[in-house]
Amino acid sequence: MSNRVIIFDTTLRDGEQALAASLSVKEKLQIAMALERLGVDVMEVGFPVSSPGDFESVQTIARTIKNSRVCALSRALEKDIDAAAQALSVADQFRIHTFISTSTIHVESKLKRSFDQVLEMAVGAVKYARRFTDDVEFSCEDAGRTPIDNLCRMVEAAILVGARTINIPDTVGYTVPSEFGTIIQTLFNRVPNIDQAVISVHCHDDLGLSVANSITAVQHGARQIECTINGIGERAGNCSLEEIAMILATRKGMLGLETGINAKEIHRTSNLVSQLCNMPVQANKAIVGANAFTHSSGIHQDGMLKAQNTYEIMTPESIGLNRNNLNMTSRSGRHVIKHRMEEMGYSEHDYNMDALYEEFLKLADKKGQVFDYDLEALAFMEAQAEEDNHYQLQQLVVQSDSTEGVATATVRIEVGGEIKTEAATGNGPVDAAYNAIARATDRRIDIISYKLGAKGVGQNALGQVDITAVYHEQNFHGVGLATDVVEASARALVHVMNLTCRADKVADYKQSMQKNRELGGV
């Protein structure tokens, strides 16, 4: 048996079913091209019979993708298979994936048929699909709850009439790993022609076991795993592609299995799917979460600085990230601060370590996480724990035109002790406020992240806006709190403006320090 596990991605079919709004054809094509770069073997890109839009997107992707096999879903109905075949016919290589329910509850309650009738429908569907391609996959929907005798009969019959891949889905995420492994093992033991097909699994995450069940399945002989980027999908989601890929890579010595995934594309692909699908990745998500390679504990940070593998079983570089993160918090030791200053290009002769660390702890206790620009200010601006308020928002007035969608904002800002009033228009109230603030401060920054949340509950809740902005190729993080979301957004921007102003002062000080060095060396 081959040790190669086929990765079947269904982000654009099962994954899209979880979205509040459908992706455009252009967005689906972007994701498909990212999946091709990632190296998925098969990508299931839609359900052509379901709508003209889905048909068009499947056809567009099938025409474009060359290095992955493109697949479309169909029920065990000739009209579905016809639509799939027509949409896929422009592809260099394609697969038709047809399915029917096999569990007792589905057969009796949903299909209102006998199992023998369902078996006949499945056989007919596979035969019909084989008219269009040799690559036919058949799925036993709700296999996890199907009586094993019936499941064996269905699998044997589908293989006999030409299915080259047999998918065993845990459709409702019901099974546990030992149970699911037994199902796969029983199929290998009892289905006489099982060597003529690849056994696939498609596990849902209702009980949080989709990845564990999929890994157990390949340990028992399955050689295709169906999954999605970031685990998106119906209800609690699907098996996560990035987790499967990195488990098989990280534990190759124990599992003896491999994939064709280009792991260095994982982070990039995860971000793209998250942005286009408007589904943020939770911070503690395995592999691709913001905290996956972040260390805050002083003990862990100390170990990481001595040897990276003390607390990391894989490197951030392996998934396409530049480096891990050592969060600078009140739990960080002196060695972490010294290490970070060295990474920014400073030697111990440039600053007073004792004074810096003392001020660092004060600031960390106050604000939680300390950033590079905070550290530089503490080191070179004489214990400046309090942030400069060169800019202070005095008043914000916004007017919106509901018919045109254009808003006008007027701001009054104190700039270095001088009051300035400016007005600007924008595409909505937040955009207008930002344009007015930029005009008043004459400071241009690029906002790359905007997050809206709440602090507190009920009537006492405040809107909290967190933004990340780029200024002179450095990221700055601003926070704004207010009862009004637009005002909170404006305060977050002014916060960033003050941080960039302080950064300019630090840069001037560093330049002066460098000149003094040069003069001293003459």
From Swiss-Prot:
Cell location: Cytoplasm
Annotated Mn(2+) binding sites: 14, 202, 204, 238
Keyword Amino-acid biosynthesis: yes
Enzyme class: transferase
GO biological process, one term: L-leucine biosynthetic process
Domain Pyruvate carboxyltransferase: from-to ranges: 5-267
Cofactor: Mn(2+)
EC code: 2.3.3.13
Annotated spans, Regulatory domain: 392-522
SUPFAM superfamilies xref list: 2-isopropylmalate synthase LeuA, allosteric (dimerisation) domain (SSF110921), Aldolase (SSF51569)
Family annotation (CDD domains): DRE_TIM_IPMS
Superkingdom to which the source organism belongs: Bacteria
PROSITE patterns (alphabetical): AIPM_HOMOCIT_SYNTH_1 (PS00815), AIPM_HOMOCIT_SYNTH_2 (PS00816), PYR_CT (PS50991)
This protein's UniProt keywords: Amino-acid biosynthesis, Branched-chain amino acid biosynthesis, Cytoplasm, Leucine biosynthesis, Manganese, Metal-binding, Transferase
Biochemical pathway: Amino-acid biosynthesis; L-leucine biosynthesis; L-leucine from 3-methyl-2-oxobutanoate: step 1/4
InterPro entries referenced in this protein's UniProt entry, alphabetically: 2-IPM_HCS-like, 2-isopropylmalate_synth_dimer, AIPM/Hcit_synth_CS, Aldolase_TIM, LeuA/HCS_post-cat, LeuA_allosteric_dom_sf, LeuA_bact_synth, PYR_CT
Catalytic activity: 3-methyl-2-oxobutanoate + acetyl-CoA + H2O = (2S)-2-isopropylmalate + CoA + H(+)
GO MF terms held by the record: 2-isopropylmalate synthase activity; acetyl-CoA C-acetyltransferase activity; manganese ion binding
Gene Ontology cellular component list: cytosol
Subunit structure: Homodimer.
Cross-referenced PANTHER family: 2-ISOPROPYLMALATE SYNTHASE 1, CHLOROPLASTIC-RELATED, HOMOCITRATE SYNTHASE-RELATED
Function per UniProt: Catalyzes the condensation of the acetyl group of acetyl-CoA with 3-methyl-2-oxobutanoate (2-ketoisovalerate) to form 3-carboxy-3-hydroxy-4-methylpentanoate (2-isopropylmalate).
Family the UniProt entry places it in: Belongs to the alpha-IPM synthase/homocitrate synthase family. LeuA type 1 subfamily.
Record-given protein name: 2-isopropylmalate synthase
Source organism (scientific name): Shewanella baltica (strain OS223)
Gene symbol of the encoding locus: leuA
